[in-house]
Amino acid sequence: MQINSQSRDVFYVSDGTAITCETLGHVVLGQFSLIPNEKTFPFVESEDKVADVIKEIEISYQRDGVKPLVFFSIVVPEIREMLLKAPAHGYDVLESIVQKVQDDIQMEPQPKMQRSRSVSKDSDTYFDRIAAIEYTLAHDDGITLKGLDEANIILLGVSRSGKTPTSLYMAMQFGLRVVNYPFIAEDVKMMRLLPEFEIHRHKLFGLTINPERLNEIRENRLSGSEYASTEQCKLELDTVEALFRREAIPYINTSSLSVEEITTRILERAGMKRRLFG
């Protein structure tokens, strides 16, 4: 039976960093008209930790009356079996792929904890990514415009157009230092490009979204508010897109794109080399 629900709780559970679970989960969920309420549980390596995750799943099921979606990667059989008994739809993100490779190459897999590369083995890469994540978090949502010289990409757009998840994905997966700046309702009255951005035009990239989709997302956050109204969404988007065109800032519509697709298009347009971190 099809359940017409615009939102669903989604859990990413792993005995490692959970980055693989999140990445594959985002790709899959991007195929559906769904607003995921996401929670991530990395380093679930003991029965106590998985018990805590199961409690969260049970709370979600009891509250919403529908089973949440769980994307997981767990090696220890006992922990895996505990998780599979939870009231959720569970998806092992590696199982079908590993089985197919095993059949094709006729070799038994040797499961191991899904750790990232060790710091000692690849310390420069590790610390580059940590620095990129810290920089991106410090420059999220217009918190500060200091240190723009260090930025690789500067994302511009209205609130809830996908800037934060895209910024963090770029930092975590590609080690890019990303600034994201939101245009708010007050900016619409006198829309202009901030002086701080003038000398960094080559780093600017705009994100826009369909007004209907923006209204849906904002209603889920602040239902009935002027901020979420269709009229306000359309006004903000029209004004910001006019700025992008006037200032020759490249931009894309994120309405039907996953963060992975958004990132790929930005990197291609910016001519930047992909440096995927494991």
Swiss-Prot record:
Q: What class of enzyme is it?
A: transferase
Q: Which reaction does it catalyse?
A: [pyruvate, water dikinase] + ADP = [pyruvate, water dikinase]-phosphate + AMP + H(+); [pyruvate, water dikinase]-phosphate + phosphate + H(+) = [pyruvate, water dikinase] + diphosphate
E.C. code: 2.7.11.33, 2.7.4.28
Q: Where does ADP bind?
A: 157-164
Q: Which UniProt keywords apply?
A: Kinase, Nucleotide-binding, Serine/threonine-protein kinase, Transferase
Give disulfide pairs as residue numbers.
none
Q: Which InterPro entries match?
A: Kinase-pyrophosphorylase, PSRP
Q: What exactly does this protein do?
A: Bifunctional serine/threonine kinase and phosphorylase involved in the regulation of the phosphoenolpyruvate synthase (PEPS) by catalyzing its phosphorylation/dephosphorylation.
List, alphabetically, the PANTHER family matched: PYRUVATE, PHOSPHATE DIKINASE REGULATORY PROTEIN 1, CHLOROPLASTIC
**Which HAMAP family is this protein grouped with?**
PSRP
Q: Which family does it belong to?
A: Belongs to the pyruvate, phosphate/water dikinase regulatory protein family. PSRP subfamily.
User: What's the protein name?
Assistant: Putative phosphoenolpyruvate synthase regulatory protein
